[in-house]
Amino acid sequence: MNDFWQHCSALLERELTPQQYVTWIKPLAPVAFDASANTLSIAAPNRFKLDWVKSQFSGRISDLAREFWNTPIEVQFVLDPKAGMRSAAAGAAPAAPRAPLTPNGPAATVAAIAANLTANAAAAPSAPADVPMTPSAAAAHHLNADDADIDLPSLPAHEAAAGRRTWRPGPGAAPANGGEADSMYERSKLNPVLTFDNFVTGKANQLARAAAIQVADNPGISYNPLFLYGGVGLGKTHLIHAIGNQLLLDKAGARIRYIHAEQYVSDVVKAYQRKAFDDFKRYYHSLDLLLIDDIQFFSGKSRTQEEFFYAFEALVANKAQVIITSDTYPKEISGIDDRLISRFDSGLTVAIEPPELEMRVAILMRKAQSEGVNLSEDVAFFVAKHLRSNVRELEGALRKILAYSKFHGREISIELTKEALKDLLTVQNRQISVENIQKTVADFYNIKVADMYSKKRPANIARPRQIAMYLAKELTQKSLPEIGELFGGRDHTTVLHAVRKIADERSKDAQLNHELHVLEQTLKG
């Protein structure tokens, strides 16, 4: 029995992502094998994990058991809280070091860094949670366009006199005192809380994180510009602040500026009104690192786009790094000059997707820990299973649970969580269905909805069907067998193959990744 489980665990570890393996398979333990009845009992430490493993992995474990014993084996799952304790005693694997990425020039694509992610992915389970900017921090960065002065922090006198210097990251000394550190962050507008160390990593963002680390290590050289896009609350702002903070550690005197696109627009307007464009250009053209957040706000602002184009050209010519975020793919941003779009596409463009289940759990557990609350795994899994869209939604739900618990003087449990999130859960229950996914994908690829259920296998039908299966797994709570049934009674192994195939290709194929992003945004409304 133990020999089989070692064999089974080793195979599943190769087939699954590190985070999936650590979350679902590692806590399991074989407890009994009846050779006469051909039954194997496997224990899970809590009810949620038992139900999830039973629905998602029982078929694969049964297949491996049949191959191992050369006879059909009935796999039974039982509840045993000690199973988790036994697994925990084995210890966690040490985090892998950051793997460097090899720059491929200005035409680099997502595929260019995919092959370098092995070491970074291995570190994913131990990475702490994403901590997006709080509303108060965001307000400090996004000054009101009607009452803000032109926001051009002055450089230290000795730097201003020295003129433009070619800068490379090096082992810079830390600020000598707190006042100097405060001044450094005031000039850069960086949030010192947002670092690589407290950014949780999973399949949804590992490419973006790896690219960000590479840029932090080689600013102005590897991928310039770096363009990150994705929905609200997925960690784009966190990552670009992390890059800036890393550069400040490497070189305390670096000229860095984070600015939201709305503030940049406001500054352009005020510079125009006050005839202060020389100062404006002198400041932005002298930076070592420019971080522009939510550039879609440039849409329709022709004068702002013109000034940014000149700043972009000057910075890139001086080997300074430019990093941009948006809520959508560059070519999908309306009202932006074609010259700028072509510049955005000249570097590396990476999508950040909504976090997967294991990543959402890690974010909740870490956030609860930072609030001094011991959140049970069952509650974290319950919340993560029902709230799927972004990190801010998860954190908002957690705050609601904590407030509800404190107000009623009750311990946090699944029952209390259901009460606290009653309105949220009602909305979620009305969301995406497999049928809606099938119709949306069929329309997108110009095939019939009936082809989703048919046995036809030409590529122009089989491919969209696999994509629909992948989206059904990612965006609904249906199990693999349930999804297979809704796709013409297909076996769960067929669905699993489709999910793995599309997930793997997505990490390597920028066009497929873009198509999936469009479909996901369409389905989420």
From Swiss-Prot:
Oligomerizes as a right-handed, spiral filament on DNA at oriC. Pfam families: Bac_DnaA (PF00308), Bac_DnaA_C (PF08299), DnaA_N (PF11638). ATP binds at residues 233, 235-237. This is Chromosomal replication initiator protein DnaA. Its main location: cytoplasm. Domain I is involved in oligomerization and binding regulators, domain II is flexibile and of varying length in different bacteria, domain III forms the AAA+ region, while domain IV binds dsDNA. PROSITE patterns: DNAA (PS01008). Residues 189-405 are annotated as: Domain III, AAA+ region. Belongs to the DnaA family. GO terms for cellular component: cytoplasm; plasma membrane. One of its GO terms (molecular function) is ATP binding. PANTHER family: CHROMOSOMAL REPLICATION INITIATOR PROTEIN DNAA (PTHR30050:SF2). Residues 160-182 are annotated as: Disordered. NCBIfam families: DnaA. Residues 1-71 are annotated as: Domain I, interacts with DnaA modulators. The keyword ATP-binding applies. Residues 169-181 have a biased composition (Low complexity). Gene3D superfamilies: 1.10.1750.10, 1.10.8.60, 3.30.300.180, P-loop containing nucleotide triphosphate hydrolases (3.40.50.300). Plays an essential role in the initiation and regulation of chromosomal replication. ATP-DnaA binds to the origin of replication (oriC) to initiate formation of the DNA replication initiation complex once per cell cycle. Binds the DnaA box (a 9 base pair repeat at the origin) and separates the double-stranded (ds)DNA. Forms a right-handed helical filament on oriC DNA; dsDNA binds to the exterior of the filament while single-stranded (ss)DNA is stabiized in the filament's interior. Keywords: ATP-binding, Cytoplasm, DNA replication, DNA-binding, Lipid-binding, Nucleotide-binding. Residues 71-188 are annotated as: Domain II. One of its GO terms (biological process) is DNA replication initiation. It is found in: Cytoplasm. CDD domains: AAA (cd00009), Bac_DnaA_C (cd06571). Residues 406-525 are annotated as: Domain IV, binds dsDNA.
